[in-house]
From Swiss-Prot:
Disruption phenotype: Opaque seed endosperm, late germination of seeds and plant retarded growth.
InterPro entries linked: DYW_dom, E_motif, Pentatricopeptide_rpt, PPR_At4g14850-like_plant, TPR-like_helical_dom_sf
Taxonomy, superkingdom: Eukaryota
PROSITE patterns tied to this protein: PPR
Gene: OGR1
Lineage summary: Eukaryota, Viridiplantae, Streptophyta, Embryophyta, Tracheophyta
Ranges where the record places region Type E(+) motif: 462-492
GO biological processes: mitochondrial mRNA modification; mRNA processing
Segments for region (Type DYW motif): 493-587
GO cellular component terms, A-Z: mitochondrion
Protein name, per record: Pentatricopeptide repeat-containing protein OGR1, mitochondrial
UniProt keywords, alphabetically: Mitochondrion, mRNA processing, Repeat, Transit peptide
Pfam families in the record: DYW_deaminase, E_motif, PPR, PPR_1, PPR_2
Transit peptide, start-end: 1-30
Location in the cell: Mitochondrion
Amino acid sequence: MSVSAAARHLESLLPRLASLRHYLQFHARLLTSGHLGAHPGLRARFLDRLALSPHPAALPHALLLLRSLPTPATNDLNAALRGLAASPHPARSLLLLAGRLLPALLPRPDALSLSFALKASARCSDAHTTVQLHALVLRLGVAADVRLLTTLLDSYAKCGDLASARKVFDEMTVRDVATWNSLLAGLAQGTEPNLALALFHRLANSFQELPSREEPNEVTIVAALSACAQIGLLKDGMYVHEFAKRFGLDRNVRVCNSLIDMYSKCGSLSRALDVFHSIKPEDQTLVSYNAAIQAHSMHGHGGDALRLFDEMPTRIEPDGVTYLAVLCGCNHSGLVDDGLRVFNSMRVAPNMKHYGTIVDLLGRAGRLTEAYDTVISMPFPADIVLWQTLLGAAKMHGVVELAELAANKLAELGSNVDGDYVLLSNVYASKARWMDVGRVRDTMRSNDVRKVPGFSYTEIDGVMHKFINGDKEHPRWQEIYRALEDIVSRISELGYEPETSNVLHDIGEEEKQYALCYHSEKLAIAFGLIATPPGETLRVIKNLRICGDCHVVAKLISKAYGRVIVIRDRARFHRFEDGQCSCRDYW
């Protein structure tokens, strides 16, 4: 057999290598036949397969082979780098690579080498290494490579350095769709969903910036929908949906799943379910069902969440996310027995979130002893969130002893957030124990803990309007305050009396009524009434849970003004219509 024929024969064997023994035998054959040095292309392809093999000993053997080569080629380095980037320990692998290969620059890395290294640094969120690799990109003169710069941008974004990611993007003279997608996803998944949407609109209006024949793809749409879902911008979400239709992406299952999530989080349950039912049954995935069940749950339709869970086809096995979504639905609807039944029948090991939902379910129902017993009998120690859940239940039912126990546990765990103090203070205030309230506030001051201010915002004609309690910063604040006076007058005719028990301060009754009147969600609703046509649905998002008085007021406004009002608070959705709320006053 000729040398070239032998090489071709060995090449044909590469796809058949299935075990570490096969790889070692192939390596030995390369050594004994002389092909290891004579055919660098074959060697690099072998290294690539070896480095990516799932066997735990394969990658170390690939690195050993690389270091044994007297004159390794760049392709050899890239094969090892690719394996390192995909390995379970990219940080350790990068350290090994930086210490033994890159400083000597033998072999000389190319754009592909740096791309694999950047993927590894992104996986381990190593911003420092990304900066060093960025310097190497400039030093080696490969800063014109669009794919490499896209990977650099992506690495910065995944390391949380969105400013550097944007700088790389802005300095690029040529951008392909992957470049736009990387920054879109980075902004949407990071802390800048508003910037992500602005970037999406820029892309939507600037197709000429993409190379010829390139179009937005499912990654583009999913990132934009994620941003809409986070902020609760229904109109923007609908625009993204229409945009997806232009490119035939609205039938893509991944896009559909994101649409379900977006519509449900923007308060349009009906649209979310329309998208779910538009997916062919055979194409519906676990993610599709999880998104639809979560949609029912967050809107307080626990019974519907249970029914959809029971209707899941046998080919789809529920996972932890599925069970959590169903349990949340039971929790928001007060379906205690159903929730316990689902929890006790779980086919996956429950985690802290599952236990936390059960504790909340029992706590809301007033079964505080069972809730406490669940906390102390779990197979792992309760975390801060679980004790906060129990503290919230104690506050809801005014049980001082349990509240103090939970607060002490939180202190032992090192929790020092405003919510812990506020809940305990509220329990004391509900019992008119003002000295204890003062003591809690003194502790907050001494620990430099500040209460997170409540705020609400609403979207009118594509513009977000934000309000805080007692806000007078809005340009139309005087109109808003006059509208509130009219609201109070009209709903008083329907029997409204301010629930001053929600004002947890030792002040007079008149002062309490004034404090209640100008809560941020009331300001947002009042603005919506004067800024939108009669009959239009009002949508409000609040960063904290809605208070009892605002809940009553929203119900009465929906009746007095003939409006549907949808409020998304920290925990769930409330849909107010004709004097009723979708939560059935269980929240």
